């Protein structure tokens, strides 16, 4: 398992969120998730301007093994999507916590962050899944 950046929060479904200034939340999937999925071949991105509720399906990623929904960790409006993924979905495999981000959400309820998992809590979820 790769190192999990300490500035992220997680959902049990393996999405991560990095909070920036101005209530901006960058969202992607964990290294663990991309490893489980294998080589990604397609990413269906949300539309800029879409309103997402926390826990709602925001995007879909497809690999040679399976398709998987990506859930929004927070409530808000999509203000940016990673268009690079349309041509190079494998960017998620190569750099899930960096260049492989999926979308940026302008949060409407920043307090939702407290409901998400810390890196340590997420690591515990992964370890309990392995047993």
UniProtKB/Swiss-Prot annotation:
It comes from the Bacteria. Keywords: Lipoyl. Binds 1 lipoyl cofactor covalently. GO terms for cellular component: cytosol; glycine cleavage complex. The keyword Lipid metabolism does not apply. It holds the Pfam family GCV_H. Its cofactor is (R)-lipoate. Residues 24-106 form the Lipoyl-binding domain. One of its GO terms (biological process) is glycine decarboxylation via glycine cleavage system. The modification N6-lipoyllysine is found at residue 65. The keyword Endoplasmic reticulum does not apply. The glycine cleavage system is composed of four proteins: P, T, L and H. NCBIfam families: gcvH (TIGR00527), PRK01202.1 (NF002270). The glycine cleavage system catalyzes the degradation of glycine. The H protein shuttles the methylamine group of glycine from the P protein to the T protein. Belongs to the GcvH family. PANTHER family: GLYCINE CLEAVAGE SYSTEM H PROTEIN, GLYCINE CLEAVAGE SYSTEM H PROTEIN-RELATED. This is Glycine cleavage system H protein.
